[in-house]
């Protein structure tokens, strides 16, 4: 593919485009199914007030829910994928708008589902299972819904809570508008006096630069700007945390953490174990910080020195064909069945490979009933090869869950999602290290791996600890001020990175830059997922077929049980600190290997 000019969609060869005709042969077929969805509210309404009348009625309603899920899956995938391949195409924006209107009507028509199912008496529900054994298929789904009974309020109270919904979103919306739309950063200046635009998107590439003057300038531009608005940022974050605690209290949870984790069936202890395990392994990060300082040859290491590669000029050129071949070889330990699905995806146009005008940026995998779809914007880099392995990990997880679970349990939760993708990355990395003899390239690979550990395991855990602490402060009646938040965030950076790095005043403001603090206990899942993936990749390489069998069983599991049980079946117990300790021990070994490779 030419790099001089980004091609139009029509200029991209067919074999590099995803096969959306596998969902609908034509746009007209999509429109026919949309009409079916538009007719669903009437079919749903026929069940209102009747879910407790008989086993047959409840079963028929659950079957209708499955039918709607399958229909929405096809309609949503086709419209969203078509829109993403060329965002300038107004036709598919229109499709998405029509679909959203139909979704809203369906959801509104089915608003009676939760209250009616929750109100069925336990004895009666057990009798339903006896009267109609087919209903047992939905037992887990019904139990999950009914588990919330203790946290569902009276009808009048629920109405009031529902009215606060938009208000509860306000802190995130205000922060998003402020940070993404209103904030402007002064240009960063490099060692030659050349100006570089600083945006949220350009910031990381700028602090990855070999030019230290530019790195420092970008760092000061970013955090100097946030410093001017520190009280505004503290007020929006405080409002967000107060809202989260209000909803937890209103729904009779012990804490905001318990409320957030309850929906995904993850015990609170898993969150706290993560923080404890990382605390116990801080020495590895201190070793890495010391090594980074030594390799960069600086008198003092600053936070703007953390992102620049210590082996800057060893990147490899890897074409898409080479990337596919290497990924196939690297994932050979997964066994023939896994590789067959991977080849099917490569050969049957599951992947939209290259950039074109108007195409959505980045990369993702989308599970669909026919087969998954993967969006890439492939450049011939090492990073893009890892992205291919990562997204195909998600894709095969979706494929196996869809093929092996009934519709109601075919989706998987975020807590396990990153495991399947990151396990592939870990296997690819270990394959490359085993098969790379060039000293400089090995060091480049190890540096890449170490940075994943730093940014995913240590950094996200630090975020998770900060989030927990500010929630505890609000729950205890303390106020969140800019000064207090800066102090807490500075202390955590000192704890996580040690004395080998200068605690720049600017880094104390980083909390103001992180949108994830508005996502309600979300970030910890990156760290737990990464730990589980590292542990499972090691297990697969060590034990072979039995470990692979366990792992494939996990990929087939969808959400047929809770995420901790699913991962336990794969061979990793996230209810303990062991997987995190093992992953961090591997990080420690890699730091040593990096030191040897660069000596």
Language-model region placement:
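Long, K/E/R/D-enriched contiguous segments that form extended
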Residues: 295-333, 339, 373-374, 397, ...
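Active-site recognition of the HExxH zinc-binding catalytic motif
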Residues: 252, 379-399, 421, 426, ...
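Short pre-active-site segment immediately N-terminal to the catalytic Zn-binding motif
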Residues: 316-318, 370-389
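A well-structured
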Residues: 1-313
């Amino acid at each position: 593919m030419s790099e001089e000019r980004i091609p139009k969609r029509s200029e991209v060869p067919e074999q590099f485009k995803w096969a959306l005709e596998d969902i609908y042969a034509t746009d007209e077929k999509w429109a026919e199914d949309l009409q079916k969805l538009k007719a669903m509210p009437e079919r749903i309404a026929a069940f209102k007030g009747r879910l407790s009348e008989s086993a047959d009625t409840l079963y028929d309603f659950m079957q209708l829910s499955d039918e709607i899920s399958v229909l929405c899956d096809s309609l949503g995938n086709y419209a969203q994928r078509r829109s993403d391949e060329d965002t300038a195409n107004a036709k598919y924006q229109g499709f998405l708008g029509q679909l959203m209107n139909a979704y809203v009507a369906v959801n509104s028509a089915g608003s009676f589902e939760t209250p009616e199912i929750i109100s069925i008496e336990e004895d009666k529900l057990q009798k339903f299972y006896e009267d109609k054994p087919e209903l047992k298929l939905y037992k887990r789904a019904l139990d999950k819904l009914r588990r919330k009974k203790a946290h569902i309020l009276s009808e009048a109270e629920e109405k009031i809570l529902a009215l606060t919904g938009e208000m509860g979103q306000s802190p995130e919306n205000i922060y998003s508008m402020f940070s993404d739309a209103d904030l402007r950063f002064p240009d960063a200046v490099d060692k030659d006096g050349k100006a570089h635009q600083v945006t949220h998107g350009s910031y990381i590439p700028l602090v990855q630069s070999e030019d230290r003057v530019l790195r420092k300038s970008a760092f000061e531009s970013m955090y100097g700007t946030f410093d001017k608005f520190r009280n505004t940022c503290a007020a929006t974050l405080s409002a967000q945390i107060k809202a989260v605690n209000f909803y937890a209290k209103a729904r009779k949870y012990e804490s905001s953490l318990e409320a957030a984790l309850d929906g995904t069936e993850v015990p609170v202890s898993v969150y706290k174990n993560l923080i404890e395990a990382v605390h116990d392994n801080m020495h590895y990060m201190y070793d890495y910080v010391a090594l980074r300082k030594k390799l960069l040859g600086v008198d003092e290491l600053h936070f703007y020195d953390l992102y620049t590669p210590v082996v800057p000029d060893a990147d490899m050129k890897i074409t898409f064909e080479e990337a596919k071949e290497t990924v196939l070889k690297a994932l050979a330990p997964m066994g023939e069945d896994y590789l067959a699905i991977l080849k099917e995806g490569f050969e049957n146009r599951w992947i939209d490979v290259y950039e074109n005008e108007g195409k959505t940026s980045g990369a993702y995998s989308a599970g669909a009933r026919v087969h998954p779809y993967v969006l890439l914007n492939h450049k011939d880099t090492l990073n893009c090869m890892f992205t291919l392995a990562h997204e195909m990990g998600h894709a095969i997880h979706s494929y196996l869950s869809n093929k092996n679970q009934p519709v109601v349990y075919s989706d998987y939760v975020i807590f396990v999602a990153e495991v399947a993708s990151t396990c592939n990355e870990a296997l690819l990395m270990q394959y490359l290290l085993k098969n790379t003899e060039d000293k400089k390239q090995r060091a480049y690979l190890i540096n890449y791996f170490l940075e994943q550990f730093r940014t995913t395991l240590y950094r996200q855990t630090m975020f998770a600890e900060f989030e927990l602490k500010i929630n505890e402060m609000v729950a205890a009646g303390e106020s969140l001020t800019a000064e207090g938040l800066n102090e807490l965030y500075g202390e955590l950076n000192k704890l996580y990175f040690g004395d080998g790095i200068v605690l720049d005043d600017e880094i104390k403001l980083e909390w103001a830059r992180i949108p994830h603090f508005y996502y309600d206990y979300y970030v910890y899942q990156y760290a737990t997922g990464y730990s589980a993936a590292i542990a499972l990749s090691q297990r697969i390489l060590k034990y072979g077929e039995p470990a692979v069998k366990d792992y494939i069983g996990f990929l087939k599991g969808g959400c047929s049980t809770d995420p901790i049980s699913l991962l336990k079946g794969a061979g990793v117990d996230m209810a303990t600190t062991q997987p995190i300790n093992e992953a961090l021990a591997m990080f420690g070994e890699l730091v040593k290997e990096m030191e040897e490779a660069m000596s």
